[in-house]
Amino acid sequence: DPFVQLGTLDVPMVNVPNEKQADWVLVGNDKKYRIQSQWDYSRPVDIYLMNVKDGSQKLLAENVCIGGFSFSPDGQYAVVYDKVAQDWFLYTVATGEKVNLTENMDVEFVDDEHDTPSLASANGSAVWFEDSKSFLIRDKFDFWQFDPLKPGTPKMFTDGYGRKNDTQLSVTQIIEDPDKAPMNPMMRMFGGAMELKKNETIYFTTYNRTTKQNGLAMKDKGKAPVKKIVEGPYTFGDFKYSKPGKGKKGIFVYARGNFEEGNNLFASYDNFKTQKQMSDINPQQRDYNWGTVELVNWQTADDIFCEGLLFKPEDFDPNKKYPVMIYFYEKNANTLYRHRNPSPSRSTVNIPYFVSNGYVVFVPDVYF
């Protein structure tokens, strides 16, 4: 069979379903909107279905500002977030039929904390189950499950766990063999799309908006209520899990760190009752006056609740006076438990450098 060119200068966006034998791919053409993109940051595109056998195209939607996208694994459906409508839409590939999934729901799916002069995106991407019979979409806190054959009957998938605990959930995939992770490389551009199995445990990374703590939660076999596995004053990442052998317990391996501790490798052999440090990535830090960080909040004269980060030298003495450096740019309170490396910067304030040299650094969130 002859080769068929899918992507061109006019059609730079090509998204291929995980089903490699699919007859159609989704392509985005922004050619007629490129001039206006010089002043219009929304960057709309026309969406086409392209036949992989002959390169023919079928218009699916015009002038769409995409803020989230996911193809079903079998290539029969596409789920698109329209930033203008602030809703998710389901497209049926074979017919081009379009259904608004979220217009009649009582929760919002737009990022309501978006504060730049541009259209807001969704709260993450749609995540499909590998059989293409359902998919998940997140509101601000929780995930809803949709059936493409019954798109008007969404079901709460995470039991309201996120909203009840002021915690934002994000689906994450923890597997034994990374080579077996079903991932469409093109979809990584849209938030790391993945495929879920209905009869396997589904994991969620968690972020508590009140305490700023991070963690991990699970929904066993996709049916049981969401259960917190671990949460703490750290940033967690790169979770791996070794399934238990006969008579043994499973092992979690992951990275953990915060401002005061480097990002080290940890392991838990007892489902996070204890955590064992496996590496010492930055021993030289102990030779320096490092620092501490705390979350502060206050109310403005116009009744806006504000947050900020206060960094102090490790040897801080409350009875002494210190020079203060204020870094005033966007929002940073959500990075309370992020590790920061000392390094030169051409524009920002390197916080470890200043606190190590006897400064107090205050980083207030900016509200527009």
Label for each model-derived stretch:
Residues 223, 237-368:
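Serine-hydrolase catalytic core recognition
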Residues 1-252, 257-263, 267, 341:
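Beta-propeller folds
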